Design a protein with these regions (language model features):
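Cytosolic juxtamembrane amphipathic/interface segments immediately preceding
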Residues: 4-19, 129-136
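Alpha-helical transmembrane segments and their helix-start/interface "positive-inside/aromatic belt" motifs
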Residues: 12-32, 140-147
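Helical transmembrane-bundle signal
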Residues: 24-41, 69, 73-89, 119, ...
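Membrane interfacial helix motifs at helix-loop boundaries and amphipathic/re-entrant anchors
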Residues: 36-70, 158-184
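Cytoplasmic juxtamembrane regions at transmembrane-helix boundaries
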Residues: 85-107, 216-222
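Hydrophobic, aromatic-rich membrane-embedded alpha-helical segments
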Residues: 105-127
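Membrane-interface alpha-helices
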Residues: 125-153
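Short, highly charged, low-complexity non-transmembrane loops/tails of multi-pass membrane proteins
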Residues: 206-236
Length: 249
């Protein structure tokens, strides 16, 4: 590269920051709506024990909850794909900045992030490796552990809610509805924690990693000695007498 040339940064790969934010916000909204509709359904189930509900109202509440569950499922899957693409692109940029290739191939990253149950162990490992590559494990520790804990809890409750969704008695349906409410709330909290983790990582660009500033004592200013005026030569008495002349009386 010659002196007159400027280095052009490589184009950003993976999803844009705007698309990541939009996906996370949409997923949180869909999960919140799903939790709300299941809460409405649970309320109607309680009311139906003492008051006979209109079949149209009962059917609408049931099908709206089902549609919300389907929308939440697709939203979570789409969010997982976008976050996986973001992680792969961020890791590639971080290791390229260190002049090293990513030690894990793309297929391994996708499998570890997208395969259910497997991603509980491997997805956080991939994020920890990213934090180490950017020399920021301590700064991101709280966000990583918060997201990881919520991820495990959300998966466990979701599996339990799905496994108990085939019950047919009234009490079992009510209990399963509560399980889904908790599952959606935990999933929403997990996505919020993932968003906070992404924002924390994006806060420091790869091209400008975080620095640790060290306070250095300021050197004392040099003291200038006052300028000394040159000594004035002693004045000699004016010559009033000339040779060959007597002094005046």
């Amino acid at each position: 590269m010659t002196a007159g040339e400027t280095r052009v940064a490589p184009p950003r790969q993976g999803p844009s920051p705007w698309s990541v934010r939009a996906t996370l916000s949409t997923t949180v909204a869909v999960l919140g709506v799903a939790a709300l509709l299941h809460f409405v359904r649970y309320t109607l189930l309680i009311v139906n024990r003492s008051v006979l509900l209109n079949p149209i109202v009962a059917g609408a509440a049931t099908w709206l909850a089902v549609l919300a569950s389907v929308a939440a499922l697709f939203s979570v899957i789409g969010c997982a794909y976008v976050l996986t693409d973001w992680l792969i692109a961020r890791r590639a940029a971080a290791f390229e900045h260190r002049h090293q290739p990513d030690p894990r191939p793309g297929w391994a990253l996708r499998a570890g992030c997208l395969v259910p149950i497997v991603n509980l162990a491997w997805a956080p490992v991939f994020v920890l490796e990213l934090a180490l590559a950017e020399d920021r494990p301590a700064r991101l520790r709280r966000e990583i552990w918060t997201w990881w804990g919520l991820f495990i809890a959300s998966t466990a409750v979701s599996v339990f809610a799905t496994a108990t969704s085939f019950t047919t008695d009234a009490q079992g349906i009510a209990d399963n509805t509560v399980s889904f409410i908790v599952a959606y709330l935990l999933a929403m909290a997990t996505v919020v924690a993932a968003a906070q983790l992404v924002f924390a990582v994006e806060r420091a660009p790869v091209e400008r990693p975080a620095h640790r500033w060290v306070v250095v004592a300021e050197e004392p200013a040099p003291q200038h000695e006052p300028e000394q005026k040159p000594e004035k030569a002693p004045e000699t008495p004016a010559e009033v007498e000339r040779e060959g002349q007597e002094p005046a009386a």
